[in-house]
């Protein structure tokens, strides 16, 4: 192949993206019959080196395989389509003017009737063009072969300590920005630092404490809000709303059944807190993060999936192992914090609901009520709705969020049980009670408006564990839905309800 004349002994080459880039010049010299790119969304940016290297192949037959062709915006979708069918959607500039701009304006929560009409027309036109080269298979296929998956979006109240630090961070950032405007200095790096502080604070105050102690930290003045005894305990679930909910869920599960957990976070510092919690409660655990070799990862995954293993929790770094791992030894997964990219969260949450799973699965997404986490989740919802319209040709996908609302990242909404539910303008809930059920056909892929909404009444929550901890004092709202319908015998459901009644000392405990 190196000289372009000798026929390869083996007609198929299996190669990673990284290795391909190393040998791109050699591979460019030969005519290739077909290229198949798994995890095709890695080519979402036409400017990156991997895309350009693959695009240089002498190959007319190109196939991309991806579960998430749209992760953030329509230009990513354009890049994928343009790779397999160059010119089908015009140039990037033409695509933006002809399709992206009218579609996005039409999807805005404040769009006029005329803008919605133009957006729908542009969407239909684009779908007509690309459907000639796209075969779409959704996760609905899995429902024929896998047990039921129950998804829960759990809004958790911050503690008073978290709220006070959160508001001080916002006030300080406003002052810092005003000073930077006067000095005409750039604020991009400081803005990212501010966002990171808010996100970590939502997980646990300990995650920002050490950073704030540094004398050059721009938020150093938040230190006086911490109690003198703050560092007395390495892990104190009572100082974090989400950690408190996690602690309750793990405790009730451990007490009532033999289910195991995967705990996922984007931050290794948070995983450190998981470790301390497991030690505090005496839970067996294994941990996977970016410091592990491939052999080490395979070993601990095999160990955890062994039915005879004693490990109760698998502690997983989303960035290190959110893709490709099969963790069917657990059937419960807690996504402790959100990512900006919905595809990353979806990949991580798919670790337990996979081929070989025999138990019903329970997914819990924890969000700090009214915080930047709910705003991030709203952005995820907006992006997924866009994907539903464009990729899956979804009909009547609701427009819940305007572009202006999605920019309101930093305001802390302390008076609402869920900022997301408030922005849905839900017509099925009256005074915190769901007055009518979603349609029977609704599932985990449906619009949030078609999920169950539980604020004051936990009886409709299918998961007996979450029903049991609903009144722990830290949960303000729960969205919940299932992957598909199965009939549960009435007698069995009554037995579950009886088995998982909250203990008197748990209910209402703070």
Language-model regions: role of each:
Residues 188-191, 368-510:
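C-terminal accessory region of SF2 helicases/translocases
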Residues 38-39, 336:
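Walker B catalytic acidic pair
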Residues 34, 42, 51-135, 179-182:
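Conserved P-loop NTPase motor "coupling/switch" region that bridges the ATPase
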Residues 144-162, 170, 182-313, 319-320, ...:
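Conserved Helicase C-terminal RecA-like lobe
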């Amino acid at each position: 192949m190196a000289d372009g004349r000798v026929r390869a002994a083996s007609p198929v080459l299996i190669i990673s993206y990284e290795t391909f880039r190393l040998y791109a010049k050699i591979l460019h010299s030969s005519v290739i019959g077909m290229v198949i790119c798994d995890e095709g969304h890695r080519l979402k940016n036409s400017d990156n080196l991997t895309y350009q290297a693959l695009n240089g192949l002498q190959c007319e037959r190109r196939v991309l395989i991806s579960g998430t062709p749209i992760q953030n915006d329509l230009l990513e979708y354009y890049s994928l389509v343009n790779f397999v069918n160059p010119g089908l959607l015009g140039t990037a500039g033409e695509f933006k003017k002809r399709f992206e701009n009218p579609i996005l304006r039409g999807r805005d929560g404040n769009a006029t009737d005329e803008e919605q009409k133009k957006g729908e027309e542009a969407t239909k036109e684009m779908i007509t063009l690309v459907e000639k080269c796209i075969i779409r298979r959704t996760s609905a296929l899995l429902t024929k072969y896998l047990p039921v998956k129950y998804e829960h979006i759990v809004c958790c109240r911050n503690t008073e300590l978290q709220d006070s630090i959160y508001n001080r961070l916002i006030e300080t950032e406003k002052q810092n920005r005003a000073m930077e405007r006067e000095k005409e200095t750039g604020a991009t790096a400081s803005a990212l630092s501010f966002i990171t502080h808010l996100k970590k604070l939502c997980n646990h105050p300990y995650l920002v404490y050490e950073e704030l102690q540094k004398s050059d930290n721009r938020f150093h003045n938040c230190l006086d809000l911490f109690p003198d005894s703050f560092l007395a305990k390495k892990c104190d679930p009572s100082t974090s709303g989400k950690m408190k909910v996690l602690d309750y869920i793990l405790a009730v599960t451990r007490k009532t059944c033999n289910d195991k957990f995967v705990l996922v976070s984007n931050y290794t510092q948070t995983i450190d807190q998981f470790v301390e919690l497991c030690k505090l409660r005496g839970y067996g655990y294994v941990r996977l993060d970016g410091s592990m070799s491939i052999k080490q990862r395979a070993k601990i995954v095999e160990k955890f999936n062994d039915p005879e293993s004693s490990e109760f929790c698998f502690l997983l770094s989303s960035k290190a192992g959110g893709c490709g791992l099969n963790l069917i030894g657990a059937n419960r997964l807690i996504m402790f914090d959100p990512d900006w990219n919905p595809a990353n969260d979806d990949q991580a949450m798919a670790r337990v609901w996979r081929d070989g799973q025999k138990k019903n699965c329970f997914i819990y997404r924890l969000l700090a009520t009214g915080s930047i986490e709910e705003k991030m989740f709203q952005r995820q919802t907006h992006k997924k709705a866009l994907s539903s319209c464009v990729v899956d040709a979804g009909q009547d996908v609701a427009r819940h969020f305007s572009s202006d609302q999605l920019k309101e990242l930093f305001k802390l909404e302390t008076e609402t049980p869920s900022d997301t539910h408030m922005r849905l303008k839900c017509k099925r809930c009256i005074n915190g009670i769901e007055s009518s059920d979603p349609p029977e056909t609704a599932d985990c892929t449906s619009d949030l408006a078609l999920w169950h909404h539980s604020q004051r009444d936990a009886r409709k929550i299918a998961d007996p564990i979450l029903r049991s901890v609903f009144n722990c004092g830290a949960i303000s709202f729960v969205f919940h839905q299932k992957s598909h319908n199965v009939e549960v015998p009435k007698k069995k459901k009554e037995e579950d309800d009886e088995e998982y009644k909250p203990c008197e000392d748990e209910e209402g405990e703070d």
